[in-house]
């Protein structure tokens, strides 16, 4: 054992070191996103993480109709506007049935499931596109583009 005192704790520098990269505020140019107005749940609830009991409850529930408000394939989620009004419903990519990627204006049917942990908000599950939006290009999950 040594009788030397422990070294003093490291202190942050008292002067500002500047590299030049952080001196200027950075702004990001972004295209407007229709997803910005909606709140995406965190963590994202997916079919894979849903409990069996929640899946059973949703499957036994009523079928609703709505229109796809927006869907971003790269982000893996979007929103549905219910046909009977009310707030937009969150949609995760894992809950889309069928061969087409939803686009704005597609008519859909869906069931609803509450989003944990508080179960205050709802998400669409078992989503089926019933009518493709006219005048739009639709993509299959495998990447083929079909003009409508």
Curated annotation (Swiss-Prot):
Residues 63-130 form the CSD domain. GO terms for molecular function: mRNA 3'-UTR binding. Keywords: Acetylation, Cytoplasm, Phosphoprotein, RNA-binding. Gene3D superfamilies: Nucleic acid-binding proteins (2.40.50.140). Residues 1-12 have a biased composition (Pro residues). It is found in: Cytoplasm; Cytoplasm, P-body; Cytoplasmic granule. PROSITE patterns: CSD_1, CSD_2. GO terms for cellular component: cytosol; P granule; P-body. Its main location: cytoplasm. It comes from the Eukaryota. The keyword RNA-binding applies. Can be phosphorylated by DYRK2 (in vitro). Dephosphorylated by calcineurin in a Ca(2+) dependent manner. Residues 1-47 are annotated as: Disordered. GO terms for biological process: regulation of mRNA stability. The modification N-acetylserine is found at residue 2. The modification Phosphoserine is found at residues 31, 33, 42, 53, 59, 147. InterPro entries: Ca-reg_mRNA-binding_domain, CSD, CSD_CS, CSP_DNA-bd, NA-bd_OB-fold. The modification Phosphothreonine is found at residue 46. Homodimer. Interacts with STYX. Binds mRNA and regulates the stability of target mRNA. This is Calcium-regulated heat stable protein 1. It comes from Mus musculus.
